């Protein structure tokens, strides 16, 4: 159990190191307004903190830097949110100012603005298409035996799918088909369309379209549930180059190589808990990230988690600021998506 004096010294060391990236010595601490102890007391307390594993000495300096254990204690017990500036809030609110809300643009903009505000790398995992509901479908003939189905979801996502008809289909039948699909499938989750067609829509096709069986077969391949593609949006991929810890080219190259592998990036989100989650240094699953911290946050529709945001930075990350930004952005995203999904 750390004493109040040790807690204060640890907090000041970490806050100073976050800002300066320079080892912190007793002389630096003695100049801090909140530190009122003698230099001898500071040195003794620092020695105890080092012995306990919360700070460590670097080879090139007499000062101390936080250890992973120190950062973990700081995050778990000493972290307090910071008040965001008007500039911060204006930038965040600009994400949602578009009159026409489009899922992909909004998520992409969130990634970019978070990277701008933190100067770290941001990754946003957007909702999968299966989380969307069909709002409208149009079918546009492009050849006698081919058409394009235009699917619009409740979140503004637009997807084109090709329909290959086995024989010439009458335009009047296509019009009937569109009316039936819109009437029976509007509001149905995208990954349930195929099932609904063969359980329910088939009855209406049989009643109203002569060669319904050939059209039904065409719909089977068109609306077959695709794999749930999880879409990633990045901001500031090379921001790590601005951090002193990553002036080592080999270190940053291995990290950038990891970020380019989509499946590896997706794994970063797999163990994310609801809300805010923080992994520090070797707590991360990849060796390439042992000098990094990863902060993830989830956003929801009502209480259902539909996406996540990750910020990757050095272990010397400004945790308070990043957590405050993520809380604000995920709250706004949750409200925006909830209003869309409830329409």
Curated annotation (Swiss-Prot):
Pfam families membership: HrcA
Key words, A-Z: Repressor, Stress response, Transcription, Transcription regulation
Example of a GO biological process term: negative regulation of DNA-templated transcription
UniProt family annotation: Belongs to the HrcA family.
One Gene Ontology MF term: DNA binding
Domain of life: Bacteria
Protein name, per record: Heat-inducible transcription repressor HrcA
Gene name as annotated: hrcA
Function: Negative regulator of class I heat shock genes (grpE-dnaK-dnaJ and groELS operons). Prevents heat-shock induction of these operons.
């Amino acid at each position: 159990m750390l004493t109040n004096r040790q807690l204060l010294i640890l907090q000041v060391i970490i806050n100073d190191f976050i800002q300066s990236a320079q080892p912190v010595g007793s002389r630096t601490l003695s100049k801090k307004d909140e530190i009122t102890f003698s230099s001898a007391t500071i040195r003794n307390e620092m020695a105890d903190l080092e012995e306990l594993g919360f700070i460590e000495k670097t080879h090139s300096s007499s000062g101390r830097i936080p250890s992973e254990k120190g950062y973990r204690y700081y995050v778990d017990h000493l972290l307090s949110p910071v008040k965001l500036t008007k500039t911060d809030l204006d930038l965040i609110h600009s994400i949602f100012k578009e009159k026409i809300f489009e899922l992909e643009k909004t998520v992409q903009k969130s990634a970019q603005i978070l990277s701008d505000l933190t100067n770290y790398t941001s990754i946003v995992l957007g909702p999968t298409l299966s989380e969307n509901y069909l709002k409208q479908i149009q079918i546009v003939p492009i050849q006698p035996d081919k058409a394009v189905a235009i699917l619009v979801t409740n979140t503004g996502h637009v997807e084109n799918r090709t329909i290959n008809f086995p024989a010439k289909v009458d335009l009047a039948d296509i019009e009937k088909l569109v009316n039936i699909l819109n009437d029976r499938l509007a509001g149905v989750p995208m990954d349930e369309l195929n099932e609904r067609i063969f359980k329910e829509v088939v009855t209406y096709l049989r009643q109203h379209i002569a060669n319904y069986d050939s059209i039904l077969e065409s719909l089977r391949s068109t609306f077959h549930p695709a794999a749930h593609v999880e879409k990633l949006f990045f901001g500031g991929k090379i921001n790590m180059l601005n951090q002193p810890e990553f002036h080592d080219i080999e270190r940053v190259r291995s990290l950038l190589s990891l970020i380019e592998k989509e499946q590896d990036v997706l794994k970063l989100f797999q163990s994310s808990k609801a809300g805010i989650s923080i992994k520090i240094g070797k707590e991360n699953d990849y060796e390439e990230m042992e000098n990094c911290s990863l902060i993830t946050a989830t956003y929801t529709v009502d209480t259902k988690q539909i996406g996540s945001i990750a910020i990757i930075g050095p272990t010397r990350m400004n945790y308070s600021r990043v957590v405050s930004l993520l809380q604000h952005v995920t709250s706004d995203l949750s409200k925006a998506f909830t209003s869309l999904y409830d329409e």
